[in-house]
């Protein structure tokens, strides 16, 4: 063999070895890549499976809800149809075995109710055993005023009678001082001055004819009672007490607005 052929053979053997080496390394790389791809594929398949499991659990719950909603809807429609059937029977429709539509049933019901209300308004029932107790059905309605009852009248009349009795008793007790036509008692224009002394002192006794001024029962009409001549003719001449004159003088012409009282007081003052 020549040296040239030997060199060619050695180069070819080296190339084959390197090729075999590369070929052996390539399957290893391809195996590694396939393992990575398989691992990636397994990991990618796990997530969709979990999602599928979740999706499968959700429709189960929604299906139960749909079933319950359907049951409720069927029951509602059944009640609805039964109510319309009862209304059709109450209207006594006669369509040769055909049912009225829902709209026609409602229209007939409205017309029937309107006709009945008009009839009852024009022809009220006579001799009703039990009248309606609602306030809206009464003639006065809700704003009817309450009629005064006998009990309310008595409760109002009793305090009024008591007030009148007390007023009459007070006036009867005051008439012993203000009796006589000369100067009738008046709360606004009194005939005597409030500063003058009306009653005598305790040491001065009253005449037996008139009794004590404080005793209402023993009082006799002499000074201010009786007629005009008896009141100012005899009574003033027989009075021995000076305080009567002082009282009349102090009363004077200031506190007697009455014309008759004015002239009488002027006459007494002149005496």
UniProtKB/Swiss-Prot annotation:
Changes seen on gene knockout: Morpholino knockdown of the protein causes severe truncation of pectoral fins at 72 hours post-fertilization.
Record region (Disordered): 17-49
bHLH domain mapped to chain residues: 64-116
Acidic residues biased stretches: 22-38
UniProt record, GO biological process: developmental process; pectoral fin development; regulation of transcription by RNA polymerase II
One of the record's GO cellular component terms: nucleus
Stored Pfam families: HLH
DNA-binding found in the keyword field: yes
Molecular-function GO terms, alphabetical: DNA-binding transcription factor activity, RNA polymerase II-specific; protein dimerization activity; RNA polymerase II transcription regulatory region sequence-specific DNA binding
Keyword field: Developmental protein, DNA-binding, Nucleus, Transcription, Transcription regulation
Signal peptide from the UniProt entry: none
InterPro entries for the chain: bHLH_dom (IPR011598), bHLH_transcription_factors (IPR050359), HLH_DNA-bd_sf (IPR036638)
Compartments, as annotated in UniProt: Nucleus
Role noted for this protein: Transcription factor, which play a role in limb development. Is an essential player in the regulatory network governing transcription of genes implicated in limb morphogenesis.
Protein name per UniProt: Class A basic helix-loop-helix protein 9
